[in-house]
């Protein structure tokens, strides 16, 4: 995925609350010959699900490359290092490093020993052949950490780019962004990234997905961090006799428009479940 100049397509899956591992793998079977990789999420919304590394391992065995999402919310250093060693042992070497969704006030306890930046640094330590305490790793393997980003924050806050560049300098090999449905915003983001040489060796993948209705889009822009959907898009969906088909068309049109933008290397297609 990182050794190509081709436009990258990634997608994602969220393990279910189940003991049926086969069913989790079957959810992504249609992506095997289409996507470059699939993200496996790590207990999003702070809700317990089937272990993400177990699901990711089975998906990897099916022939589809995997990006393991890993949060610092639930695990201390020992647990995180164990997960990273486990991932490498089954051939998973791409890890999207996240702080993780935080629980409600009366929700489960969290650890938060590592945020996204700290996880990127931890990955680079592991890739260097040791644990954090200096213990040598037998049969060390390369690992490619990734960072998350929000386009709207980038184009509205002058210091946001410095924070992203810091993640690249720490060792992030790729960036996956939150949903964006606005070409002008992606273009501004592209132009801002292009002012920095830091992204020459980092793949930037824009998050998007087909909206099914205006109601869904309105909910997303009101409730999801970093998501801004224009009134024009919502009106187009609302006026459509087939809003799901219109949502797919909007997504496809946007992909075609951004493919030649500098510093934009692919799209991360997500299926909104709201």
Language-model-detected regions and their locations in the chain:
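Active-site-proximal loop/turn and secondary-structure-junction residues that shape catalytic pockets
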Residues: 13-17, 42-46, 72-74, 99-103, ...
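Structural motif
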Residues: 33, 90, 170, 261-262
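Active-site mouth loops of central-metabolism enzymes
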Residues: 7-22, 66-78, 143-159, 237-249
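Hydrophobic faces of well-ordered beta-strands that scaffold small-molecule active sites
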Residues: 9-15, 36-40, 66-70, 95-97, ...
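Active-site-adjacent beta->alpha loops and helix N-cap segments on the catalytic face
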Residues: 20-22, 46-58, 76-82, 102-135, ...
């Amino acid at each position: 995925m990182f050794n190509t100049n081709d436009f990258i397509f990634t997608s994602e899956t969220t393990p279910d609350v189940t003991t049926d591992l086969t069913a989790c793998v079957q959810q992504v079977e249609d992506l095997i010959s289409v996507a470059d990789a699939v993200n496996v999420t790590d207990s999003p919304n702070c809700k317990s699900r089937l272990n993400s590394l177990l699901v990711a391992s089975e998906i990897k065995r099916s022939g589809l490359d995997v990006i393991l999402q890993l949060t610092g919310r639930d695990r201390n250093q020992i647990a995180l290092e164990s997960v990273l060693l486990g991932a490498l042992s089954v051939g998973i070497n791409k890890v999207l490093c996240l702080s993780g969704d935080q629980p409600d006030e009366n929700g489960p306890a969290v650890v938060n020993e590592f945020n996204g930046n700290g996880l990127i640094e931890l990955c680079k330590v592991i890739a260097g052949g040791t644990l954090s305490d200096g213990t040598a790793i037998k049969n060390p393997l390369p690992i490619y950490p990734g960072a998350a980003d929000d386009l709207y924050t980038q184009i509205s806050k002058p210091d946001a780019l410095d924070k992203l560049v810091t993640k690249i300098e720490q060792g992030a090999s790729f960036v996956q962004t939150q949903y964006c449905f606005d070409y002008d915003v992606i273009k501004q983001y592209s132009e801002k990234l292009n002012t920095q040489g830091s992204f020459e060796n980092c793949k930037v993948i824009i998050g998007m997905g087909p909206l099914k209705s205006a109601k869904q889009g309105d909910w997303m822009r009101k409730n999801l961090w970093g998501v801004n959907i224009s009134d024009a898009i919502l009106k187009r969906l609302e006026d459509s006799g087939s809003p799901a088909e219109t949502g797919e068309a909007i997504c496809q049109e946007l992909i075609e428009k951004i493919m030649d933008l500098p510093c934009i290397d692919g799209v991360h297609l997500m299926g909104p479940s709201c």
